[in-house]
């Protein structure tokens, strides 16, 4: 009899890819395991995510990995600056998810063993309970921020403090998942905002009800944060550090622009190019664009810069390419840097990071981007823009010595609609530091890359955690 798990990912590219990759790793580790991935369509036109969903549902090559799409009424584009949060949208799909699962498990050769839900789909634990099976969670960020969220919720429920009342304060707080005090003003908007905090608290309470949490991290990368879950015993779910879960496929090999970028990198000396890329939601204002260009000009470094125009509201609209770079870049910049740099709209990040020419990575600190950089042994400059990225940056710089900060305590959050402009001086300084060839940061990253690779091998910590999860799933079946 097949053991069936139901996966419910969030329909965003940064969540879909690691979830599907994890599902493939699981069925590759246990022959009796079968997985159905419930695809909930994106609320709006999600670009890459929609394309990813389409490719997944048409290219499934393993009969033990099944994709089941549910139908959702397409919502028209909205001008509402604060659309319905993802968690609320997902919760509204419970009935359709329940029906899809019920239709799937009529097969007598399959026994439903549990749900594995995305961190933003935690409300689906209610559906798992209806089927009488355990609910596990995939946490696509890191153990440090997972611990931060749970601690904020615990302090609130125990009436010790309300973190939203400390907004804009210089107060530092102790978090069990961090070794150093953390400045409250650098917590994400979802925790410090009176409007968003209740949703985050409800989410954290739901996390605590999970049977276990699969975290996209490595035991050797976050030993202190993971210790928090070990010493709390029954108060917190079992955590399985199974990372790095990475999507390392290199996209469309026939794309001429992509091929040109990669050919150019092949022509550059080893570790000579600084790569600037800020994720699917990262865009720059004209002022920030000019400051960055001045920094690159003065630094003298070779560079590959993914530049897009900031969206007026990233909750509803993605950044777009600049139509005329010469209008926003300093006069003569493109001509002066023609032989040592490229300004592009988009790049295949993984394919770029694995090139020997890349010597440093200026990143928005999305967790997937951090893991990719560590995997390829590329030291980072942290330039956090939104969500938990300031916590990620703090961990990389202050806790682990794996990155250089663009500047200390960067103000603003793209989700809140405002970001501090970083000066050319700060950017140039950070770029020069990260490109140093024998720095402690570079050596630390090289060592961590080796640990990340070994973690996924036989005898490695992440491989062992994955096997432990499978064992627990089987033991938790009725």
Swiss-Prot record:
InterPro entries: UDP-glycosyltransf_plant, UDP_glucos_trans, UDP_glycos_trans_CS
UniProt keywords, alphabetically: Glycosyltransferase, Transferase
EC number of this enzyme: 2.4.1.-
UniProt source species: Arabidopsis thaliana (Mouse-ear cress)
Entry superkingdom: Eukaryota
An annotated Gene Ontology molecular function: quercetin 3-O-glucosyltransferase activity
Gene name of the record: UGT71B5
Binding of UDP-alpha-D-glucose, residues: 280, 347-349, 364-372, 386-389
Functional description taken from the UniProt entry: Possesses low quercetin 3-O-glucosyltransferase activity in vitro.
The name this protein goes by in its record: UDP-glycosyltransferase 71B5
Family in the record: Belongs to the UDP-glycosyltransferase family.
PROSITE patterns for the chain: UDPGT
């Amino acid at each position: 009899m097949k053991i069936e798990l139901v996966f419910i990912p969030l329909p965003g590219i940064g969540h879909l890819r690691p979830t599907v990759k994890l599902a493939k790793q699981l069925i590759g580790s246990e022959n009796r395991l079968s997985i159905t991935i419930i695809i909930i369509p994106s609320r709006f036109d999600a670009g890459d995510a929609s394309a990813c969903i389409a490719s997944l549902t048409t290219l499934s090559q393993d009969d033990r990995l099944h994709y089941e799409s549910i139908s959702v009424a397409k919502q028209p584009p909205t001008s509402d600056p604060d659309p319905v949060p993802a968690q609320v949208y997902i919760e509204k799909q419970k009935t359709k998810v329940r029906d899809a699962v019920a239709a799937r498990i009529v097969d007598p050769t399959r026994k439903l063993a549990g749900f594995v839900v995305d961190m933003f789909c935690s409300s689906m634990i209610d559906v798992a309970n209806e089927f009488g099976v355990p609910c596990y969670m995939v946490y696509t960020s890191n153990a440090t921020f997972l611990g931060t969220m749970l601690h904020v919720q615990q302090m609130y429920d125990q009436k010790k403090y309300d973190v939203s009342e400390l907004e804009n304060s210089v107060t530092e707080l102790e978090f069990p998942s961090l070794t150093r005090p953390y400045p409250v003003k650098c917590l994400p908007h979802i925790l410090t905002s009176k409007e968003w905090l209740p949703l985050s608290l409800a989410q954290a309470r739901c996390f605590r009800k999970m049977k276990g949490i699969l975290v996209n991290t490595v035991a050797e990368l976050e030993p202190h944060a993971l210790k928090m879950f070990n010493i709390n015993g029954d108060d917190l779910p079992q955590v399985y550090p199974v990372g790095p879960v990475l999507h390392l496929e290199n996209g469309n090999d026939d794309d001429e622009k992509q091929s040109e970028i990669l050919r150019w990198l092949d022509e550059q000396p080893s570790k000579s190019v600084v790569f600037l890329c800020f994720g699917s939601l990262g865009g720059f204002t004209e002022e920030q664009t000019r400051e960055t260009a001045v920094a690159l000009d003065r630094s003298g470094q070779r560079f590959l810069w993914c530049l897009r125009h900031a969206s007026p509201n990233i909750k509803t609209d993605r950044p777009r390419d600049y139509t005329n770079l010469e209008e926003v870049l300093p006069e003569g910049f493109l001509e002066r840097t023609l032989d040592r740099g490229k300004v592009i709209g988009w790049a295949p990040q993984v394919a770029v990071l694995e090139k020997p020419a890349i010597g440093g990575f200026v990143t928005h600190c999305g967790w997937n981007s951090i893991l990719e950089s560590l995997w390829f042994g590329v030291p980072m400059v942290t330039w956090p823009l939104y969500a938990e990225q300031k916590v990620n940056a703090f961990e990389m710089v202050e806790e682990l010595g794996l990155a250089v900060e663009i500047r200390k305590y960067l103000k603003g959050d793209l989700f809140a609609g405002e970001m501090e402009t970083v000066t050319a001086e700060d950017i140039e300084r950070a770029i020069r530091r990260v490109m140093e060839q024998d720095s402690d940061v570079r050596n630390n990253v090289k060592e961590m890359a080796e640990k990340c690779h070994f973690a996924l091998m036989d005898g490695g910590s992440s491989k062992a955690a994955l096997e432990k999860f499978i064992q627990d799933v089987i033991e938790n079946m009725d």
